[in-house]
Amino acid sequence: MKEIAVFGLGTLGKSLAISYSNMGGKVIAIDKSQEKVDEISDYVTFAIRADLTEENVIKGLGVANVDVAIVTIGENFEASIIVTAVCKEIGIPYIIAKARDKLQGNILTKVGADEIVYPESETGIRMAKNLAHGEKFMDIAEISDTFSIIEAKVPESWVGKNLMELSLRKKV
């Protein structure tokens, strides 16, 4: 598994760090709050308290050899920019950054993020789709603008039949 560094231990960062660690991944979790670092220290490989607005502090964290940096800082966009830029500068191969909106996403991309996530809007879209489709769909994962993977509850009449027997294309 890849070794990751998670910068910012709010709801998203903490959940990501603990979940990935529970799957067997190595996680370096970093936050400015000693309380948040203490809460997560038993669950991750390393938990570090650091001022993420200081370039030299970030460079001194020993994260240059991780495979992926995930920047989930929510309250201080300046810190997100600095962390993203420094991670790119020290050669971390892949950087994922959290943004609130497209403007933040564009800025983070310009300073080095390879992937931008918008947790609030992505959750809202997923909830709306689930509500619109009622109980038909259990989960929807968007692969691209034109492809999705859907986990659906199937009618009893479909059980035991293959896709050809169902003639789904004729019914759509």
Task: Name each model feature, range by range.
Residues 1-172:
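Cytosolic regulatory regions of ion transport systems
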